[in-house]
Amino acid sequence: MKTLHLLRHAKSAWDEPGLPDRERGLNKRGERDAPRMGEALSRRMAPMAVVASPARRAQLTLEGLCRGWPALGECDHTVDEGLYTFSADDLFRWLLDRDDRQQSLFIIGHNPALTDLANALAEDDGLANLPTAGYLQLALQIDHWRDMRQGCAQIEFSLFPRQL
């Protein structure tokens, strides 16, 4: 069995017209929510390496998580260009190529890719929208990432900033 941890980047800033999408940072709410989510997640799970989108808002979200969850900051995190996508199909293909030695993956990415992926993998759970800085833990009934398919997962846990 595999476990997939999905976290949408925290609320991004839109106050600089003309700034490329990849370069947008976080607004005040995003800066507040990321550490709070890190602190809340630290009470529930062990720290692990995170793979994040190269978008600045995803990187700042990871930094905020680590401020709220210092042990997470001690893990080796990576940035992967494949996570800068808004397509669930692209994200699905990216996951199929993961190393099977990884039993759990924690990724920070973007909507609508994350919501659509969660709904495809956990069909019966029907998530309307993964909010900014929202977290999902999915249990996948597979032994190999390449065997991932629609309906192979259940949402085991969710946490959204408004719950804190």
Residue ranges and their predicted role:
Residues 58-59, 88, 114-115:
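Short, well-ordered alpha-helical microsegments
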Residues 98-106, 111-134, 142:
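Non-DNA-binding regulatory cores of transcription-related proteins
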Residues 82-95:
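Short alpha-helix plus adjacent loop in nuclease-associated cores
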Residues 61-65, 91, 117-118:
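Hydrophobic packing residues within well-ordered alpha-helices of enzyme cores
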Residues 2-81, 127-128:
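Active-site-proximal alpha-helix that buttresses catalytic centers in soluble enzyme cores
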Residues 124-156, 161:
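Domain-level recognition of soluble alpha/beta enzyme cores
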Residues 18, 118-122, 149:
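Short, flexible helix/strand-to-coil boundary loops that buttress conserved ligand/catalytic motifs
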